[in-house]
From Swiss-Prot:
This is 3-isopropylmalate dehydratase large subunit. GO terms for biological process: L-leucine biosynthetic process. PROSITE patterns: ACONITASE_1 (PS00450), ACONITASE_2 (PS01244). Keywords: 4Fe-4S, Amino-acid biosynthesis, Branched-chain amino acid biosynthesis, Iron, Iron-sulfur, Leucine biosynthesis, Lyase, Metal-binding. InterPro entries: 3-IsopropMal_deHydase_lsu, Acnase/IPM_dHydase_lsu_aba_1/3, Acoase/IPM_deHydtase_lsu_aba, Aconitase_4Fe-4S_BS, Aconitase_4Fe-4S_dom, IPM_dehydratase_rel_enz, IPMI_cat.
Length: 473
């Protein structure tokens, strides 16, 4: 019987299988940042161990790094705990001898899930782990990638392996072509809206169908980034020419004979025609409209042409209660049109949507509208995903477009996605955000988050409220 893409990668990395089915899985790439690594490095020291395979590590500071004040260097990091974590990462990586390190203030520093792919550290067929939930991003390359906990970070550092039980296989097919103006973010939010945040629990999801194949590599990264928000362990897209062309020539990609050998293998990284999936979900791409979340979970999402749901129309008591709680927290009334929701702040960034194509998408809307940020917007900020993205955007003049309209153009980092630095919402503030989670307090205590695409966020900044960007497509 044929094998799925997930089966192929998982099986080829099994070192040993226990009687209960738990596998010892070899890990090819270990992405490291400043928040979940200090305890792991300290654990190695206390046990008298060293990092088993230093060359597998790619490290950067991203969660705590400030997006302003870089001219002051490390003194620009206001929070002492944040500063300590960043300094500690510098020391730990230096001590470990890892060469692929992109520290705070360096040209190639950025969000770990942005700098990994752009440096060629993420390759098809790899197993990739990181002490971060959104490691699933790297599945866009036909790699098996998922987040791990701090104790597992230490385990991988010490042994280059991870204990794992094989997940079930889910195929999500997005059939046909999307309408103009519909983005990867809209596609993945529509998927989550359909299957729910528990729909993928126990599964690894392979994303397929014409709409997925049509996406660029950056679009596929956006989709796989949010596989975890559908409850899945990981998300995958089969390798094709787009994958190979994206990787070619990047600093950490193979070259010469090794490149030829790698490409020959990568071309096998797709599910066989007779592969069996445990679950199949299908969406019609033509039916997907610009998406906006209204509640406190990514599954609480609707099209821009919809209205805020009425809990009284929900028959399930638990679901009705969840809707009521979400509406209370979000300060929304049932029946309110989604395009009549005004926002206070706009955040364009995060590991979901901070790459160069995201910057171009948002800037194109701003340029087309030709107006300033609306008066009710307290802050509209654009945070590139890496130093290289920032440089490229500035070469293209995108920063000038944003700044002329009243946006703040910031330094790279995770920023307002999770409010671990100074970028955050105040209680009651409402934000149009291109990030991946709209949980209570995610962007700051009492903050209200609406997840949207970069184009939708840019349009909301100019109009002051959500609008249907299809009219600008």
């Amino acid at each position: 019987m044929g094998r799925t893409l997930y089966d192929k990668i998982f099986d080829e990395h099994v070192v040993h299988t226990e009687e209960d089915g738990t596998a010892v899985l070899y890990i090819d790439r270990h992405l490291v940042h400043e928040v979940t690594s200090p305890q792991a490095f300290e654990g190695l020291r206390e046990a008298g161990r060293k990092v088993w395979r230093v060359s597998s590590i790619v490290a950067t500071a991203d969660h705590n790094t400030p997006t302003t004040g870089w001219e002051r260097g490390y003194d620009g990091i206001a929070d002492p705990i944040s500063k300590e974590q960043i300094v500690t990462l510098d020391k730990n990586i230096q001590e470990s001898g890892a060469a692929a390190f992109f520290p705070f203030l360096s040209k190639r520093q950025g969000i770990v899930h942005v700098i990994g792919p752009e440096n060629g550290a993420t390759l098809p067929g790899m197993t990739v782990v990181c002490g971060d939930s959104h490691t699933s991003t790297h599945g866009a390359f036909g790699a098996l990638a998922h987040g791990i906990g701090t104790s597992e970070v230490e385990h991988v550092m010490a042994t280059q392996t991870l204990l794992a039980k094989k997940a079930k296989n889910m195929l999500v097919k997005v059939n046909g072509k999307v309408a103009p103006g519909i983005t990867a973010k809209d596609i993945v939010l529509a998927i989550i809206g359909k299957i729910g945040t528990a729909g993928g629990t126990g599964y690894t999801i392979e994303f397929a169908g014409e709409a997925i194949r049509d996406l660029s590599m950056e679009g596929r990264m956006t989709v796989c980034n949010m596989a975890i928000e559908a409850g899945a362990r990981a998300g995958l897209v089969a390798v094709d020419d787009k994958t190979i062309n994206y990787v070619k020539g990047r600093p950490l990609a193979p070259t010469g004979v090794e490149w030829d050998q790698a490409v020959a293998y990568w071309k096998t990284l797709h599910s066989d025609a007779d592969a069996k999936f445990d679950a199949v979900v299908e969406l019609n791409a033509a039916e997907i409209v610009p998406q906006v979340t209204w509640g406190t979970s990514p599954e609480m999402v609707l099209g821009i042409d919809a209205v805020v749901p009425d809990p009284d129309k929900e028959k399930d008591p638990s679901k009705r209660g969840a809707i009521e709680r979400a509406l209370t927290y979000m300060g929304l009334q049932p029946g309110k049109p989604m395009d009549d929701i005004f926002v206070d702040k706009v955040f364009i960034g995060s590991c979901t949507n901070s790459r160069i194509e995201d910057m171009r998408e948002a800037a194109a809307v701003v340029k087309k509208l030709g107006q300033k940020v609306a008066k009710n917007i307290k802050l509209a900020m654009v945070v590139p995903g890496s130093g290289l993205v920032k440089e490229q955007a500035e070469r293209e003049g995108l920063d000038a477009i944003f700044k002329a309209a009243g946006f703040e153009w910031r330094e790279p980092g995770c920023s307002m996605c999770l409010a671990m630095n100074a970028d955050r919402l105040e209680p009651g503030e409402r934000c149009a955000s291109t990030s991946n989670r709209n949980f209570e307090g995610r962007q700051g205590a009492g903050g209200r988050t609406h997840l949207v695409s970069p184009a939708m966020a840019a349009a909301a900044a100019i109009h002051g409220h959500f609008v249907d960007i299809r009219q600008f497509a």
